Amino acid sequence: MELSEIKRNLEEYQNHLNQIRGSLDLENKETNIQEYEEMMTDPDFWNDQTKAQDIIDKNNALKSIVNGYYQLTNAVDDMSATRELLQEEYDEDMKIELEEEVQQFEEQIDQYELQLLLDGPHDANNAILELHPGAGGTESQDWVSMLLRMYQRYCEQNGFKVETVDYLPGDEAGVKSVTLLIKGHNAYGYLKAEKGVHRLVRISPFDSSGRRHTSFASCDVIPDFNNDEIEIEINPDDITVDTFRASGAGGQHINKTESAIRITHHPTGIVVNNQNERSQIKNREAAMKMLKSKLYQLKLEEQEQEMAEIRGEQKDIGWGSQIRSYVFHPYSMIKDHRTNEETGKVDAVMDGEIGPFIEAYLRKEMDSRDV
């Protein structure tokens, strides 16, 4: 790469950053950061821990955007200074190092822009992720356990905390259903890309004849709404609350007391379970919070569906809405049907490397908004 080409690239990066700045409203974000940090010095700040944590999360999110922008602009300034130095006094090792920095910088801008894509009203929230098998008994239940591990690994690799809220093991192997609470900034923003039906094609380890089987599992993802975000009144006459013994994937308190809670909301048929806490009271509180989140999400989806009908759009629903195929046999390939993103690195994906699929989905969503 010639120095003249490096100069052109750096000028393009600077122009790109100028365009980004035009849409960021940095001054307003910096003012908000200052206001949040003043709130955090108040002696009564932690009186309401939920509200306090919400302010901290919002402040951290703003600082990440603002600091990220300045880090990128400083990097361009540093690379430009190095290029000017090379122009005056050439050094081959320094030039090679600069070339690497320039080439890597494009990826840094891409990652920063991806962060900016998560600007939906609930993208910053924690996420509630549920997995359920399709028809097929043990084969589909085993597929759920594989997806469960994939999401757990993805969360570990990306700094999200995972809590197993509800877990029902399969009769022979696998999982009949599992609900995860995934905590971390933008957890919903990223994981909403996984909502839909996941299809597996492989030689079944449960088939003595070694035949190829196709299995399905559904993944549902909704935001974990804070109580102050939603206004949902639940009529006590509309719900039934049952207690049962926890049946989790392990743990000292499993099957000792009937601390687990199941709430059935009869008007909608929504059922939520919680067995994550040791006490029945805490499980009930958590289950009610999850029910409110589901009812609120249902309300939002109904409004979205009404708007889609007005616009003449039709969305796939149910088991027909396959978003991704995982083919292990007769060849190795994982393909996302929404974006055409694909890879032959099956083991890596099943070990949690689903970032490229999520990024491709978010970029497609951004492109559709720009049209």
UniProtKB/Swiss-Prot annotation:
Top-level taxonomic group: Bacteria
Post-translational modification: Methylated by PrmC. Methylation increases the termination efficiency of RF2.
A Pfam family hit: PCRF
Modified residues (N5-methylglutamine): 252
UniProt record, GO biological process: viral translational frameshifting
Gene3D superfamilies registered for this protein in UniProt: 3.30.160.20, 3.30.70.1660, Release factor
Any one GO molecular function term: translation release factor activity, codon specific
GO cellular-component term (any): cytoplasm
InterPro entries (UniProt xref): PCRF, Pep_chain_release_fac_I, Pep_chain_release_fac_I_sf, PrfB
Compartmental location: Cytoplasm
Record's keyword terms, sorted: Cytoplasm, Methylation, Protein biosynthesis
Similarity comment text for this entry: Belongs to the prokaryotic/mitochondrial release factor family.
NCBIfam families, per database record: prfB (TIGR00020)
Cited function: Peptide chain release factor 2 directs the termination of translation in response to the peptide chain termination codons UGA and UAA.
PANTHER family named in the record: CLASS I PEPTIDE CHAIN RELEASE FACTOR (PTHR43116:SF3), PEPTIDE CHAIN RELEASE FACTOR 2 (PTHR43116)
Name by which UniProt lists this protein: Peptide chain release factor 2
Organism: Staphylococcus epidermidis (strain ATCC 35984 / DSM 28319 / BCRC 17069 / CCUG 31568 / BM 3577 / RP62A)
Gene from which this protein is expressed: prfB
